[in-house]
Curated annotation (Swiss-Prot):
Enzyme Commission (EC) number: 1.1.99.1, 1.2.1.8
Pathway membership: Amine and polyamine biosynthesis; betaine biosynthesis via choline pathway; betaine aldehyde from choline (cytochrome c reductase route): step 1/1
Keyword NAD tagged: yes
Any single Pfam family the record assigns to this protein: GMC_oxred_N
Entry's family note: Belongs to the GMC oxidoreductase family.
Job description of the protein: Involved in the biosynthesis of the osmoprotectant glycine betaine. Catalyzes the oxidation of choline to betaine aldehyde and betaine aldehyde to glycine betaine at the same rate.
Active site per UniProt: H474 (proton acceptor)
InterPro entries: BetA, FAD/NAD-bd_sf, GMC_OxRdtase, GMC_OxRdtase_N, GMC_OxRtase_C
Superkingdom of origin organism: Bacteria
Upper taxonomic lineage: Bacteria, Pseudomonadati, Pseudomonadota, Betaproteobacteria, Burkholderiales
Species per Swiss-Prot/TrEMBL record: Paraburkholderia phytofirmans (strain DSM 17436 / LMG 22146 / PsJN) (Burkholderia phytofirmans)
Annotated GO MF terms: betaine-aldehyde dehydrogenase (NAD+) activity; choline dehydrogenase activity; flavin adenine dinucleotide binding
Gene coding for it: betA
Protein name from the UniProt record: Oxygen-dependent choline dehydrogenase
């Protein structure tokens, strides 16, 4: 084989790219080049390795692309944060470590589209199990020997977690013991991608640690991919910058784009694959007119409903610098304590109205009052619910702004563009207030800090959402899978109209899933890896799962305030 020639070139060492790199190199006769624009996942850096430090990577640019949106027209024209991971592990290196697979009906909804019939939940479940090692043990829903370590909530954690779950049940919503099991709907403990010794379980740790010593895998960090190289309509390699030096690499079989929902469409467009009118604006030579590239962009928007805590049991003391050395030392030496948890140990999914087919609102409970990125901490004991809608009908786009591979694209999520968005956020605030006023929280609940109890009308709540709602960091769907005119890839990630070119990451989701996106992204990469290998897919299972089928979203005899 010629120098700098490989069977497969993978662009992006994130949640999907690391899965493919690991699985493809299980075959010793297959050579893989894995390119990552960021650096290594330094294991000595507490900012990415300590679960409780999850806000730190979002505050800088070493591990975060720190994109910003265009002014969002329905959000007071705010330019909103769009953090994405940079480094081995991608966004699994900087995310909140919540392991949520989505609802079974998400995948059944994908499979309802012509050509995607093999993406039902029961087709996907074997791949969720394949990827996972859950500390509570394997069962029909969970795996026991996969690369991703998943930890469950343990006795002795902050009492606010149990109180918030109990309050949700007292408000009439279901209790579920496993948000990734038979029934997602309801309130319960949240699984997290954290190792047994309290470290972040990124895909770099889970997948690359298994694969990086293989002689058939070459990993190059600080490699910014400029464009995919083509011979006609066939992808034959990539051009990239390594520490600023131009390098070409050849792919004998395929180029696999795994750069995420922002950078994957950007790379395709820069390479000449996308909407011809957009490319013409920047004099990008057209390889293939594919108008769906960068369209259909989706995300989860969320808000923080915050309360004062009457008892001194919140994480507020952990925010004080004088307490942090002891927390860090316990974590470093023992892998225990506050530092060993992402502190998202409870949450839930609800239907706000009986005619919703599956949950449309997600909750993360946090025993402190602070923004996700560590900003705007309330200077007192407090707690909060992160509340967000799950399947907004609003759609955005990613658009190339320059042929410079270091330039950021134009990003517009078009948040809150549909009347349904406003209804769901108003419902979310009002239902959350009901939950927070339940007896289970009486001993802890102080005054409402945000939005503030004085805000009650639709107009007041809408103003709060415009001013304060933030991204949940779940961009997706911008290179969607399917066979309609706006689809970008087929049911195995192959780019329509092209040869030897795939996209494999969250951008190929036809519709965003109900919950966090790391677990679904790993699953779809595992599933497509088998197809790249030419293997038969894992057999569809017949494991039961909950479908509401008209069941009321909450018990009417519950306490309401």
């Amino acid at each position: 084989m010629a120098a700098n020639e490989y069977d497969y070139i993978i662009v992006g060492a994130g949640s999907a790219g690391n899965v493919l790199a690991s699985r493809l190199t299980e075959d010793a006769d297959v050579t893989v080049l894995l390119l990552e624009a960021g650096g290594p996942d330094y294991r000595f850096d507490f900012r990415t390795q300590m679960p409780a430090a999850l806000a730190f990577p979002l505050q800088g640019r070493r591990y975060n692309w720190a994109y910003e949106t265009d002014p969002e027209p329905h959000m007071n024209n705010r330019r909103m944060e769009c953090g994405r991971g940079k480094g081995l592990g991608g966004s699994s290196l900087i995310n909140g470590m919540c392991y949520i697979r989505g609802n079974a009906l998400d995948y059944d909804g994908w499979a309802a589209h012509a050509g995607l019939e093999n993406w039902t939940y029961l087709d996907c479940l074997p791949y969720f199990r394949k990827a996972e090692t859950r500390d509570a043990g394997a069962n029909a829903y969970h795996g026991g020997d996969g690369p991703v370590h998943v930890t469950t909530s343990k006795p002795g954690n902050n009492p606010l977690f149990a109180a918030m779950v109990e309050a949700g049940v007292q408000a009439g919503f279901p209790r579920t013991d496993d948000l990734n099991g038979y029934q997602q709907e309801g309130f319960g403990p949240m699984d997290r991608t954290v190792t047994a010794n309290g470290r972040r379980a990124s895909t770099a740790r889970g997948y690359l640690d298994r694969a990086k010593t293989r002689p058939n895998l070459t990993i190059v960090t600080h490699a910014v991919t400029d464009r995919v190289l083509f011979s006609g309509k066939r992808a034959v390699g990539v051009a990239y910058l390594h520490h600023g030096n131009a390098v070409n690499a050849q792919a004998r079989r395929e180029v696999l784009v795994c750069s995420g929902a922002i950078a994957s469409p950007q790379l395709l467009q820069r390479s000449g694959v996308g909407r011809s009118t957009w490319l013409r604006e920047l004099d990008v030579p057209l390889v293939h007119d594919l108008p769906g590239v960068g369209e259909n962009l989706q995300d989860h928007l969320e808000m923080y409903i915050q309360y004062e805590c009457k008892e001194p049991i919140s994480l507020y003391p952990a925010l004080q610098w004088w307490n942090q050395p002891a927390i860090g030392l316990e974590w470093m030496l023992k892998g225990t304590g506050i530092g060993a948890s992402n502190q998202f140990e409870a949450g839930g999914f609800i239907r706000t109205r009986d005619d919703d087919l599956w949950p449309n609102i997600q909750y993360h409970f946090l025993p402190v009052a602070i923004n996700y990125n560590g900003s705007n901490a309330i200077k007192m004991h407090g707690f909060q619910a992160h509340v967000g809608s799950m399947r907004s009908p609003s759609r955005g786009r990613v658009k190339l702004t320059s042929r410079d591979p270091n330039a950021h694209p134009s990003i517009l999520f078009n948040y809150m563009a549909d009347p349904l968005d406003w209804r769901e956020f108003r419902d979310g605030i009002r239902i959350t207030r009901e939950i927070m006023r339940q007896p289970a929280l009486d001993r802890y609940r102080g005054r409402e800090l945000n939005p503030g109890a004085e805000l009650t009308t639709d107009e007041q709540l809408d103003t709060f959402v415009r001013m304060r709602a933030e991204t949940a960091f779940h961009p997706s769907c911008s290179c969607k899978m399917g066979y309609d005119d706006m689809a970008v890839v087929d049911n195995e990630g192959r780019v329509h109209g092209m040869e030897a070119l795939r996209v494999v990451d969250a951008s190929i989701m036809p519709r965003i899933t109900t919950g966090n996106l790391n677990a679904p992204t790993i699953m779809l990469a595992e599933k497509i890896a088998d197809r790249i290998h030419g293997r038969e897919p894992l057999a569809r299972v017949d494991t039961p799962y909950f479908v509401a089928n008209g069941v009321a979203s909450r018990k009417q005899e519950s306490a309401t305030v």
